[in-house]
Amino acid sequence: MLNETPALAPDGQPYRLLTLRNNAGMVVTLMDWGATLLSARIPLSDGSVREALLGCASPECYQDQAAFLGASIGRYANRIANSRYTFDGETVTLSPSQGVNQLHGGPEGFDKRRWQIVNQNDRQVLFALSSDAVSYTHLRAHETELH
């Protein structure tokens, strides 16, 4: 299921939320901004359902948190100290995003961009960043794992 929110993402367009379900009863909610996981509700053997993710109260709150909750991390994961590295003997300088360091792709990381929804149904979604030749799929049918 695909829904738009009245709240607008940093690019001025509504956040697009997707809800996926599988045969095991798992329900996952994602948004196209940052290809972000918002919720993963897992059925337990006693019949109850448990939320498996930490998250924010609303899609727009994800812009103001620094913990990368549910985020798609990239172009790289982790910290680049002092926002620079050496490649083929040349120093490459990056924009800092956490103090003097760059973290998880920096100010223009994958979590801060709108991903294209290439293909989507009730059981899976394929997101892509065509400019970076990056794509990934969430939740396949008959599984209780995210891939």
Predicted segment positions?
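General alpha-helical segment detector with a strong preference for membrane-spanning helices
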Residues: 93, 146-147
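Covalent nucleotidyltransferase core used to form phosphodiester bonds in nucleic acids
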Residues: 76, 93-120, 130-136
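Conserved small/polar residues in nucleotide/adenosyl-binding loops
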Residues: 137-146
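Beta-strand-rich N-terminal accessory domains
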Residues: 3-61, 65-69, 73-77, 81-92, ...
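Short, well-ordered turn and helix-capping elements at secondary-structure junctions
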Residues: 24, 131-133, 143
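A short, structured loop/turn motif at beta-sheet edges
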Residues: 86-90, 117-124
